[in-house]
Design a protein with these regions (language model features):
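Acidic, metal/ion-coordinating pockets
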Residues: 1-299
Length: 299
């Protein structure tokens, strides 16, 4: 029933695509297919097949987002399940990535991935603009310094990641602004630490007789300048923003109604459910709303 609540809320909120991963098959293929029928958005996967090697889902979708063609591919790292066969993800990606790229201004990969497959994907030269990955507890601060920006949004549903893409020339690579903004910020912090509280200090003069420190200063200044140049010269850009889904977020009444109705059905069937991690036997009454899905009441 919890899965039904999630699907029903996304039906109202809007969703371009869902790419299932290993955890989504915990209740079996039949359950996934039931949720797929309930959803008014597509389930996609290029490499989750039935046991005979036939596709269970469309491998990708092309979405029109404000006049920009966005190709979205679904992919998963290998996992073992009696109901499905998982094709090698890099092999599956290689078979269709050019087909999707030819139809897209922007190509996004939704990847339920092991780190080893991310590394293989990064070194394969695929024309992918952005990777949004699951199967990782990390909450990315930027997309990393490899060729393709790769973001992990964590596993608790506590944050909403927003990606604003500026497309000036679909044939040019995207610049992940967060990488260079973080590079500048970290270098500035190191320089300020060397200033020891006096932000107008001339570091070159202070450390003129300390060659190792001068070398550090030059390195940090070079990092700042190279980041500024990258930001200035970017043609297409990705700007990431994170939004904490806490008490300051105003609930949409229609979404809250779906959640509360779903919880009421669960309580009718199984009795009141405690937050995740509650020891057996503890009081399960007065459980508040858990709108971010982490099992902890928000209010």
């Amino acid at each position: 029933m919890t899965a039904e609540i999630i699907v029903s809320t996304f039906n109202e909120i809007g969703c371009h695509a869902f790419s299932p991963g290993s955890k989504d098959f915990a209740a079996g293929l039949g359950f996934i297919q039931e949720m797929q029928m309930l959803a008014n958005f597509p389930f996609i996967s290029a490499n989750i097949l039935d046991v005979n090697g036939n596709r269970l889902f469309d491998p990708y979708v092309i979405a029109d987002v404000e006049g920009v063609s966005v190709g979205i591919i679904g992919l998963a790292s290998n996992f073992i399940h009696s109901d499905v066969y998982i094709q090698d993800p890099i092999e599956a990606l290689n078979e269709l990535v050019d087909e999707v790229s030819s139809q897209s201004d922007v190509l996004v990969l939704m990847f339920d991935s092991e780190e080893a497959d991310i590394i293989k994907m990064q070194t394969s030269g695929f024309p992918i603009d952005l990777v949004i990955r699951s199967k990782s507890k990390t909450r990315s601060q930027d997309g990393g310094k490899r060729d393709i920006p790769s973001y992990s949004c964590g596993d608790r549903g506590k944050y909403l990641y927003q990606f604003d893409l500026t497309v000036a020339d679909p044939n040019e690579q995207f610049t992940d602004l967060a990488v260079y903004e973080n590079q500048m910020s970290q270098a500035e912090k190191k320089l300020n630490k060397m200033r020891k509280g006096n932000l107008i200090t001339d570091l070159h003069n202070v450390y003129k007789d300390d060659p190792p420190s001068l070398k550090k200063i030059e390195t940090y200044e070079s990092q700042i300048q190279s980041a500024k140049d990258a930001l200035k010269n970017s043609v297409n850009s990705i700007k990431m923003s994170k939004h904490e889904l806490g008490k300051t977020v105003t609930d949409r009444p229609d979404i809250l109604r779906i959640v509360d109705d779903g919880k009421a059905k669960i309580n009718e069937s199984f009795g009141p459910q405690p937050p995740s991690g509650t020891p057996p036997g503890q009081n399960q009454k007065n459980i508040g709303h858990d709108h971010d899905g982490d099992g902890i009441p928000d209010h």
